[in-house]
Amino acid sequence: MNYQETTEYLFNSTPVFEHIGASAYKEGLDNTYALDEYFGHPHTNFRSIHIAGTNGKGSCSHTLAAILQADGYKVGLYTSPHLVDFRERIRVNGEMVPEQYVIDFVEEHKDFFEPLHPSFFELT
């Protein structure tokens, strides 16, 4: 797959809230737990800050990421939605992940994803 085919796969093989509304919602955390287990509980391998709330999450997240990066930390930032390119959601030290990273990730793990039928939110 090339990058365009990969992002089309992500959008078309999973329920996307922005496209179909509330029917994309999946009750429960079973898929989240299964994905967490599959990836070896990656959140336990680094310090993280989760920013939540109604308004201002994006600007707060980007500001905090810039402050931490300026102080010498390696900073990963996940935000949504994206405006143009899916990779806008996933940045490391302010740079979008490479297209090839997204392609390789999906190709390497899609055999696990497909029978799970995760939502777009759960998968990304």
Language-model regions: role of each:
Residues A22-L29, A34-E37, H41-T44, A70-T124:
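ATP-dependent carboxylate-amine ligase catalytic core
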Residues M1-G53, C60-H62, A66-D71:
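Short functional linear segments
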Residues K57-S61, V84-R87:
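Short active-site-adjacent helix-start/loop capping segments
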